[in-house]
Amino acid sequence: MKNKIYKKIMITQGIKDIDQFKMEMYSILTSIVYDREIYKHNKELEELFLKLNIPCKPYLLKSRNQSIIKFLSVIHKSTYEELVEQLQILKKVMIESMEEDNKVETTEKTKESRL
């Protein structure tokens, strides 16, 4: 799933129409928030709020649905330039998450080879 989200981010970078860009951002953010491989616990979503410079009240972290509503309302109000900045942040989030997966896989392979 992470590879698909990353590919969608890369495709979205070339979109110039703000309405189309927003629709793609809705899709990307929803996929990231609901993917438990990226953020296993709701509390971890606070990190995403901070990276995107979105104010985060504690009640938002109790439910992924509430978090999504906040993210989507911010996207809806954003300018094209703000959306581009947010997309770059999401790209970094995905790269970090995929790199973490690679570290885990490498560690597991090393352990297996020692046995």
Give residue ranges: language-model regions.
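Basic helix-extension-helix modules of the SAP/HeH family
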Residues: K2-L115
